[in-house]
Every structure is written in structure tokens, then in C-alpha cells.
């Protein structure tokens, strides 16, 4: 009878096998701990099978149950997920180029992430966006210098306007407090627009052309025959 009770207890220990295998505590556990649990379950199922069960002693049955329970208790997926989230949030806090709204969005995503792999992906996205934001901030860092330059001052009105609009769009992204831009491609496009419109400023060329025209007029005056 004791052996029958032991077999019942062993069977009960496997009742939550499917639930356990589908849990975060198993999915995100260390591989060795996952293997220990699945091996313990396989061993227990072998004992419970009619083909092999009759050969197992009461002690072996009890040991199999203890092995299943111990392996299940040792699963550390929940701990691994919590640790991954904590580390990701610490790394997020150290990013200096994304704005607060972007940072809060990533923090919320990390909190809600169901798996360690999701946390890793979010962390990588944050790093990528931070780099894009660094380039965007750099593109407008010399805005005041550019506005005071001859290249801007003597540029055609359309090119001045193009540059001003690009800088405004960039600053709008940088200074967002709600609904932040989270796609690095959008940030990179804004950076490219600032850089391209800055390069396109033609004030220096216009000044050179104006000087050349003035020189040409002077030459014509000096070389024109007297009436």
C-alpha cells in the first residue's frame, strides 16, 4: 500500500508538468536547470508507465518524486527575467542622448516584457535610438554659428527656409515630452535633412558671384571708350 501511495504522489507531482513547461520560470531558466527538470519528468513518467513501473521499488518511486519537485523548485526563469529587467533599466538610465519621453517609453516596455529575449531586444533598440539621437543633437549643435555665418546670411531665401525648417523638425524631436519618436530611421532622416540643407546653403557662393559681378562691372567701366 505504501508503494501505491508513493506512485500516487509521483503522479500528482507531474500534474502541473504542462503548466510548468509553459511558464516563464521554465522558459527563461538556465539551460542546465531546464534539462534537470525535463530529465526528472521523463524518469518519473518511465516509472509510472505500466511497462516499467512494476520494476521500481517504493524508494525509487519516492526518490523520483523528490527529484521532480527539487528540479521544479530550482527553476530560476522568474529570477533571470527580473535580473535582466533590472540590468536593462540601469543601462537605460545611463543613456544620455534620448529624451525623457523616449526613456520612459523604453522603461515601460522593459517592465512589461514577458521574456529575457524581449528585454534584450528592447535594450538593443534603446542603444540604437540613443546613437541616432546623438547624431541628431550634433547636427543642430552649431545652429547659432550657422545662422551667424556668411554662408547663411547671403544664402537664397529658399535655402535659408529649408535649413530653418529642418532645424525646427530636429528640435521638435529632441524636445518631445509626449508621443516620442521611437523609430531610429525617423531620427536619422531628420539628421540627414539638417546636414543636407546646411551643406546646401549657398551664401558663400552668392557672395563670390556678387563680387565677381562687381569686378566685371568695374572692368567694363574702366575699359569702356570715353564718349
Place the predicted regions along the sequence by residue.
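Repeat-associated, polar segments at repeat-unit boundaries in modular proteins
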Residues: 1-10, 45-83, 106-137, 171-208
